[in-house]
Amino acid sequence: MNRLPSSASALACSAHALNLIEKRTLDHEEMKALNREVIKYFKEHVNPGFLEYRKSVTAGGDYGAVEWQAGSLNTLVDTQGQEFIDCLGGFGIFNVGHRNPVVVSAVQNQLAKQPLHSQELLDPLRAMLAKTLAALTPGKLKYSFFCNSGTESVEAALKLAKAYQSPRGKFTFIATSGAFHGKSLGALSATAKSTFRKPFMPLLPGFRHVPFGNIEAMRTALNECKKTGDDVAAVILEPIQGEGGVILPPPGYLTAVRKLCDEFGALMILDEVQTGMGRTGKMFACEHENVQPDILCLAKALGGGVMPIGATIATEEVFSVLFDNPFLHTTTFGGNPLACAAALATINVLLEQNLPAQAEQKGDMLLDGFRQLAREYPDLVQEARGKGMLMAIEFVDNEIGYNFASEMFRQRVLVAGTLNNAKTIRIEPPLTLTIEQCELVIKAARKALAAMRVSVEEA
């Protein structure tokens, strides 16, 4: 039977939510009621699949914690008052920590003046953020398009490359196996996981995938495309594959791809949605090899964990195809004042506190600890790898990876798997994680592995 709309029900629900937003604390009964509500509404109105996923990686199979608030810069607190060290970082959102006071203050100050712009008059913060990114990014990157997410930044990059290369008769894109660039139609065409692609086939034509890190495969693909007249418009890459399982290419790979792009007249698009903003020990991962892309995609941590924002930054030569008609590709909320305020504050914090260098130092410490554990538990752990504060522990099979996430949850450390590699648990904490918290994470991982070994031996 069709359900009739109910204004009264919607009003009551929204009023209840607003009351919850105003609260700073909950008593025991309120916590229990909220947990029941959230699970019920996820099941009935969001997506029950999320509940089953959380249940599979949570101690006791209780669907896991219901988030209530950030604790410190580096922790989360659930409705039961339990505090978790965040080693997931919202999949790379919280580079400057949770509720960073500088970022929150900037957004609050802007909110008091003007949350959204008129769309017609010139908005100052968009101009200032574009100027800041032009100064911050490598090479000749100069002009920025702002949006609301990583997949949108990739969509803009693909459209920009098409607009630039179409008059030159170049329409093909080369991406890599294991890549993740988002799930909107264009970005999904570059993404390389069949689970996400098959339900939406056919995707956009003209995309090819080659093995990541294999420069000869890249050269062969570019050559074949040239011979068949399918000339390549752009190569799109992640400097390190995040969702693919934190896969690092061989040293010199990005440099070699840059040279091939120049040789074949293809643009180089670097997707730094996850690796950017200091995550790998440099402001941008491409700086480890001094590689300068034609188009750079940013999002996630750009908003400081406070506001969603993405950016597509390009050279003047490429971006100029939009000069005659700046309305060819736009978005209503992209570059809004609140998001730009958050991004400007985030960049300021990253530079003032030298967080990229901290990411390198603390990342080395964590990775050394995880590699030691891999040596101690070779029956469970296949490898620990990473760069800066983007790390992964790969287990011998999928089930062990899920069990590790569950045991870490029991130790009050939040971790999760990767979308394209189920055996791999990603470690992606805020760059503000303290040395003491790094030590606690390593201790928690050791306890988790010890408990898992006992379980295996008893089975």
Swiss-Prot record:
Cofactor(s) this protein requires: pyridoxal 5'-phosphate
PANTHER family, A to Z: AMINOTRANSFERASE CLASS III, PUTRESCINE AMINOTRANSFERASE
Keywords in UniProt for this one? Answer: Aminotransferase, Pyridoxal phosphate, Transferase
Binding positions (pyridoxal 5'-phosphate): 150-151, 274, 332
Output the Pfam families linked to this UniProt entry: Aminotran_3
Mind telling me which PROSITE patterns this protein's record contains?
Answer: AA_TRANSFER_CLASS_3 (PS00600)
InterPro entries from the xrefs? Aminotrans_3 (IPR005814), Aminotrans_3_PPA_site (IPR049704), Class-III_PLP-dep_AT (IPR050103), Putrescine_aminotransferase (IPR017747), PyrdxlP-dep_Trfase (IPR015424), PyrdxlP-dep_Trfase_major (IPR015421), PyrdxlP-dep_Trfase_small (IPR015422)
Single GO BP term = putrescine catabolic process
| Name of protein | Putrescine aminotransferase
Which Cys pairs does UniProt list as disulfide-bonded? Answer: none
Q: What is its EC number?
A: 2.6.1.82, 2.6.1.29
Q: What gene is this protein translated from?
A: patA
The record's function comment reads:
Catalyzes the aminotransferase reaction from putrescine to 2-oxoglutarate, leading to glutamate and 4-aminobutanal, which spontaneously cyclizes to form 1-pyrroline. This is the first step in one of two pathways for putrescine degradation, where putrescine is converted into 4-aminobutanoate (gamma-aminobutyrate or GABA) via 4-aminobutanal. Also functions as a cadaverine transaminase in a a L-lysine degradation pathway to succinate that proceeds via cadaverine, glutarate and L-2-hydroxyglutarate.
| Similarity field | Belongs to the class-III pyridoxal-phosphate-dependent aminotransferase family. Putrescine aminotransferase subfamily.
Question: Which pathway, metabolic or otherwise, does it act in?
Answer: Amine and polyamine degradation; putrescine degradation; 4-aminobutanal from putrescine (transaminase route): step 1/1
As one GO molecular function, the record gives: diamine transaminase activity
- State the organism's lineage: Bacteria, Pseudomonadati, Pseudomonadota, Gammaproteobacteria, Enterobacterales
- Tell me the enzyme class: transferase
